[in-house]
């Protein structure tokens, strides 16, 4: 009897690929949309016309965020934009597999046109030391003034330092010496909604109907099956992802929209803004010259006044 290779059968290929695809889907799809960097896949611009940053569509809870930038910068200069995403590092979040883990953070920085991520060879050594191994990305190839980062460990990076290069209006005619706004959005922890509208397991799950809970089946990694017998005798099975902590048990009566689980979310998303002035060196030099002339004029005025007082005193003595 002739032996045939396992891979010669198309059916065997399908059997082999199904678990690989499933593993890939669980590892990369479930968690990936929870951070600002993945807004790139769904939105051309991360900031809506209303001023709302699109990360808030998936991160429904709120949390504080702050940004620190210099008040003024000169053209073609590297400076720091510090984004602060504070939270209690002792708390744990529910991961996609239902286990508990630390929180990650992410941020999107919206700079004025012309400002961009500083090239590595332009970043001073002291700023490089602060940045460490962080990898920043432009939001898209044609939007280099929009930067994203994440997910990164929140326990290490509650402050994210972006190295920014200011434009030179003498070279880039689209830039001007003006005061500009800077916007930032930052999150800690996973989101509550995926871009397709489905809920993550980082949510409260409510009863789909009024009735009685007849069964709660723990399918381990696959989550839970909660069966409800409604008032008209029909049965509804609600699938709840892994990691849920139930507020109800078998035999309990529930009403429609009544919470079945606790709220596991410990993270949140926030927005902040700042201002920066792109200063013209020639204007500053002109201001210094003007101030020098004013001081010089004041000195001459004082000297002239003293000279006049001496003349007046001499005439009185005469």
Curated annotation (Swiss-Prot):
Main location, first listed in the record: plastid
Cell wall biogenesis/degradation is among the record's keywords: no
Extent of the signal sequence: 1-34
Cellular location(s): Plastid, Chloroplast thylakoid membrane
Membrane topology: Single-pass membrane protein
Annotated cofactor note: Binds 1 heme group covalently.
Cofactors that this protein relies on: heme
Residue pairs linked by disulfide bridges in the UniProt entry: none
GO molecular function: electron transfer activity; heme binding; iron ion binding
Binding residue positions for heme: 35, 55, 58-59
Pfam families (alphabetical): Apocytochr_F_C, Apocytochr_F_N
Keyword annotations from UniProtKB, A to Z: Chloroplast, Electron transport, Heme, Iron, Membrane, Metal-binding, Photosynthesis, Plastid, Signal, Thylakoid, Transmembrane, Transmembrane helix, Transport
Annotated Gene Ontology cellular component terms: chloroplast thylakoid membrane
Transmembrane portions of the chain: 284-303
Lineage: superkingdom: Eukaryota
One GO process term, biological-process aspect: photosynthesis
HAMAP family given in the database record: Cytb6_f_cytF
Family of this protein: Belongs to the cytochrome f family.
Function comment: Component of the cytochrome b6-f complex, which mediates electron transfer between photosystem II (PSII) and photosystem I (PSI), cyclic electron flow around PSI, and state transitions.
Quaternary structure, from the entry: The 4 large subunits of the cytochrome b6-f complex are cytochrome b6, subunit IV (17 kDa polypeptide, petD), cytochrome f and the Rieske protein, while the 4 small subunits are PetG, PetL, PetM and PetN. The complex functions as a dimer.
Name the record gives this protein: Cytochrome f
Organism of origin: Chaetosphaeridium globosum
Gene (UniProt): petA
């Amino acid at each position: 009897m002739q032996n045939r290779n396992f891979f010669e059968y198309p059916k065997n290929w399908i059997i082999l690929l199904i678990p690989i695809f499933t593993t890939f889907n669980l590892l990369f799809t479930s968690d990936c949309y929870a951070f600002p960097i993945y807004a790139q896949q769904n939105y051309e611009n991360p900031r809506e016309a209303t001023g709302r940053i699109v990360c808030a569509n998936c991160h429904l809870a709120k949390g504080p965020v702050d940004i620190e930038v210099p008040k003024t910068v000169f053209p073609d200069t590297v400076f720091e934009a510090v984004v602060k995403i504070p939270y209690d590092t002792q708390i744990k979040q529910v991961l996609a597999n239902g286990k508990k883990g630390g929180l990650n953070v992410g941020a999107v920085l919206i700079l004025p046109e012309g400002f961009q991520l500083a090239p590595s060879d332009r970043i001073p050594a002291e700023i490089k030391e602060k940045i460490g191994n962080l990898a920043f990305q432009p939001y898209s190839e044609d939007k280099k003034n929009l930067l994203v980062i994440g997910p990164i460990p929140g326990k290490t990076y509650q402050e994210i330092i972006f190295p920014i290069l200011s434009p030179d209006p003498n070279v880039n005619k689209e830039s001007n010496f003006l005061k500009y706004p800077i916007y930032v959005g930052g999150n800690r922890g996973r989101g509550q909604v995926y871009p397709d509208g489905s809920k993550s397991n980082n949510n409260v799950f409510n009863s789909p109907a009024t009735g009685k809970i007849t069964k709660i089946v723990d399918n381990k990694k696959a989550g839970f099956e909660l069966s409800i017998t409604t008032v008209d005798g029909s049965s509804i099975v609600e699938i709840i992802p892994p990691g849920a902590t139930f507020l109800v048990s078998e035999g309990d009566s529930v009403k429609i929209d009544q919470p079945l689980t606790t709220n596991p979310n410990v993270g949140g998303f926030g927005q902040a803004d700042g201002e920066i002035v792109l200063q013209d060196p020639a204007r500053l030099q002109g201001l210094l010259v003007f101030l020098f002339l004013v001081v010089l004029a004041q000195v001459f005025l004082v000297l002239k006044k003293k000279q006049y007082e001496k003349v007046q005193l001499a005439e009185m003595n005469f």
